[in-house]
Every structure is written in structure tokens, then in C-alpha cells.
Regions:
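Short, glycine/acidic-enriched loop or turn micro-motifs at the edges of active sites
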Residues: 14, 73, 185
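Short, solvent-exposed amphipathic alpha-helices that sit
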Residues: 18-26, 182
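Residue-level recognition of beta-strand->loop/alpha-helix junctions
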Residues: 37-39
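Anionic-ligand-binding alpha/beta catalytic cores of soluble enzymes and soluble regulatory domains
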Residues: 121-191, 195, 200
């Protein structure tokens, strides 16, 4: 891809200089990349909202998608890369926030823990992994570095669980959760199109 797509999502708030810093880090590594700021106004540390937002990268071109909603930053939680069946790479903390998106991107193909400091920005801050670990990983991947170069492979079942599961279908019923409510009052549920179709209902 001549101009690979890197998306950035965080709970930093639009006033944060961290947003521009992450874009700068990405472009320093790969000046040919095109950076899309998907969302930076997520509620602080809210994994539900963040996971729901990451689902929408399915509307983006195949690319490298970073999520920095990370209440466990500074702890032993793992930084990870998930390669999906569609060909996207999801980069962020192992706190479940990336898992729901994989259901819309062809499932999980491969997972690695990011441990190779060759592909990190130094000095590595214990509290700004978005700048020093996640964004550099996305940028190096977009330049063609193979996922296996970043660290050891993990099994999908080793990963932290998603903040919510898929809705449960039962004949003509769906048991769902409200994931978020936008400012217009629209509800976002954990219902996929295929689950909705099974119930024979119309979806707007």
C-alpha cells in the first residue's frame, strides 16, 4: 500500500498534545503513512465505549489501528498486536478493548506481545505507551515489518476477555447489552447484523 492507513483512538481528550505527538511519532517512522484520528474524546478508562469505537474500524480501509484506553498502564499488562483475518492489525493494551473489533474484521489470525525494544521509541515512558510502544508498532508494521519481529506469539485464549460479549440469540429473542448512548439518544447494542437477521427484524 503506497499510503498505509494508521488510525489513532484514545481517551486523551481533544485538548491533549499527546494526540499530535503520536501522529508525529508515526510520521517520523513512516512519512508515507496517512493518519486518521478516529476518536480522542472517549470517557476516561471506559473500555466499553472504547471497544465499541474500535468496532467501527471495519468502515476504514485495511490498516493499522491503535487504541490507547489503558487503565492498566504502568502495570504488568501486556502490549499486544492482533492480526485479523481481513488483514488489519490492532495495536493496544491487553485489556480486552481490541477483541470486539476482531469479530468485524474476520477474526483473530495471530497475536504477539510487543517486547522487541528495537521497534519502540526511547526512552520508554511507563505511562505513555501510546507514544513509545503502540504507535511505533503501527508505523513499523505499515512499513512492512513482520508481526513476528515484535515479540513472542500468544494464543488468543491467553488474552484478556472483551468488556462485553456478543448478544445471545434465542429463537425470536435477542439478549443484548447497551454499550453506549450518543448525544442524540441513539443506543449502541452488542448485536451484529447476522444476529439481527436471524430474528427476522428490520435494522435501520
Amino acid at each position: 500500500m503506497k499510503h498505509p492507513i494508521i488510525t489513532l483512538t484514545s481517551d486523551f481528550g481533544v485538548q491533549s498534545q499527546g494526540i499530535g505527538i503520536m501522529e508525529g511519532v508515526a510520521l517520523e517512522i513512516n512519512p508515507e503513512a496517512h493518519v486518521i484520528h478516529l476518536m480522542h474524546g472517549l470517557p476516561d478508562f471506559n473500555l466499553f465505549y472504547a471497544a465499541r469505537t474500535m468496532e467501527t474500524v471495519s468502515y476504514m480501509p485495511v490498516g493499522y489501528h491503535v487504541c490507547v484506553v489503558d487503565p492498566g498502564v504502568g502495570t504488568k499488562r501486556k502490549p499486544i498486536i492482533i492480526e485479523t483475518g481481513r488483514g488489519d492489525f490492532l495495536i493496544g493494551p491487553d485489556n480486552g478493548v481490541l477483541i470486539p473489533a476482531t469479530r468485524f474484521l474476520g477474526g483473530i489470525k495471530k497475536v504477539v506481545e510487543i517486547t522487541n525494544e528495537k521497534y519502540m521509541k526511547k526512552p520508554i515512558s511507563p505511562i505513555f505507551h501510546g507514544r513509545d510502544i503502540f504507535t511505533p508498532a503501527a508505523a513499523y508494521l505499515s512499513k512492512g515489518v513482520k508481526i513476528g519481529e515484535f515479540g513472542k506469539e500468544l494464543k488468543p485464549e491467553e488474552l484478556a476477555k472483551a468488556p462485553y460479549e456478543e448478544a445471545i440469540t434465542e429463537e425470536d429473542k435477542i439478549h443484548a447489552k447497551i454499550i453506549s448512548i450518543n448525544k442524540f439518544g441513539s443506543l449502541h447494542l452488542n448485536i451484529t447484523h447476522s444476529a439481527w437477521d436471524k430474528c427476522g427484524a428490520e435494522l435501520n
